[in-house]
Curated annotation (Swiss-Prot):
It comes from the Eukaryota. One of its GO terms (molecular function) is heme binding. Keywords: Chloroplast, Cytochrome c-type biogenesis, Membrane, Plastid, Thylakoid, Transmembrane, Transmembrane helix. The chain crosses the membrane at residues 13-33, 42-62, 70-90, 97-117, 135-155, 212-232, 242-262, 276-296. Required during biogenesis of c-type cytochromes (cytochrome c6 and cytochrome f) at the step of heme attachment. Pfam families: Cytochrom_C_asm. It is found in: Plastid, Chloroplast thylakoid membrane. GO terms for biological process: cytochrome complex assembly. This is Cytochrome c biogenesis protein CcsA. GO terms for cellular component: chloroplast thylakoid membrane; plasma membrane. Belongs to the CcmF/CycK/Ccl1/NrfE/CcsA family. Its main location: plastid. It comes from Welwitschia mirabilis (Tree tumbo). The lineage of its organism: Eukaryota, Viridiplantae, Streptophyta, Embryophyta, Tracheophyta. It is a multi-pass membrane protein.
Length: 305
């Protein structure tokens, strides 16, 4: 009872802090302040500690990795969204955009798990015999890291497309406004103006962030699929059974393999590969969440209504 109470307290603390961090990150988009952004990036350490302790407590009293139902998988998903920025900061320590993407994602998944799912689905359940294996920790952890990192890369690509679209709309709007003189238009569209230079820098940064996160996520997804195949062979005597989750995982893998191919071999950057990565967002969510809603297959957590 004490552990369950502590778990609920940590859940509320985590939600409160991640909500504040999300709002602050949103504010830095409108009013960029580097010192504030850096402080918020460091501030995510505390909610990450809270949700980590939350999962450890649930692991302790349930006697297994907390992934027995949809609620626990969503909480684990939220934990992964808090973990990803630490990976990205190793390669790109000055990247502000990753927090803008991961904080709302962590908030959304946590809010859905705690506020939308019924109470009975939030209770810990016993693992079925096939899942009582050491492979559970490796396979599920790796595959979830793959899902979350790919989602971050896809969301970065959507942000890139949105910024480029806004840039084009601003161009046409300003160009056809009669009250603007030729000199003002020339300054506004000059590629070396401070505003355009800053926006171009941002686009380049987001493009690189998207590529970097997708490469990491693709690696995790590949390892996760391979480890899952080995586990399936041990549990059911077959490496591949065309389970709905397996099919959608393969489709997702092919989508992002195509993205990496056109980036590396064709040298495409900007909108074209971003469109492919944006499409991947749909397939990742179907692979994870859609199969669970259907409530079919070995990997389903069941219908939640």
């Amino acid at each position: 009872m004490i552990l369950i109470t502590l778990e609920h307290i940590l859940t509320q603390i985590y939600f409160s802090f991640i909500l504040v961090i999300t709002l602050v990150f949103g504010g830095t988009l409108v009013y960029p302040v580097n010192k504030l952004s850096n402080s918020v990036k460091k501030g995510i350490i505390f909610p990450f500690f809270c949700i980590t302790l939350n999962l450890i407590i649930r692991w302790f009293y349930s006697r297994h990795l907390p992934l027995s139902n949809l609620y626990e998988s969503l909480m684990f998903f939220s934990w992964n969204f808090c973990l990803i920025p630490f990976f990205i900061d190793i390669k790109n320590p000055n990247t502000q955009w990753i927090g803008v993407i991961t904080a709302p994602s962590a908030l959304f998944t946590h809010a859905f798990a705690t506020l939308i799912l019924p109470i009975e689905m939030q209770q810990s359940q016993r693992l079925i015999p096939a899942l009582q294996s050491h492979w559970l920790i490796m396979h599920v952890t790796i595959i979830f890291l793959g899902y979350v990192t790919l989602l971050c890369g896809s969301l970065s690509s959507i942000a890139l497309l949105a910024i480029n679209l806004e840039k084009k709309l601003s161009f046409f709007t300003l160009y056809f406004r009669k009250e603007y003189s030729y000199e003002n238009k020339r300054k506004a569209f000059h590629p070396y103006s401070f505003k355009n230079f800053r926006k171009s820098q941002m686009i380049h940064q987001i493009d690189n962030l998207s590529y970097y996160t997708i490469v990491i996520g693709f690696t995790f997804l590949t390892i996760g699929i391979l480890s899952g195949a080995v586990w399936a062979n041990e549990a059911w005597g077959s490496y591949w059974s065309w389970d709905p989750k397996e099919i959608w995982a393969l489709i997702t893998w092919l989508i992002f393999a195509n993205y990496i191919h056109i980036r590396l071999n064709k040298g495409w950057e900007g909108n074209k590969p971003a469109l492919v990565a944006s499409l991947g967002l749909f397939f990742v969510w179907i692979c994870y969440f859609g199969v669970n809603i259907l409530g079919i297959g070995f990997h389903s957590y069941g219908w939640f209504l």
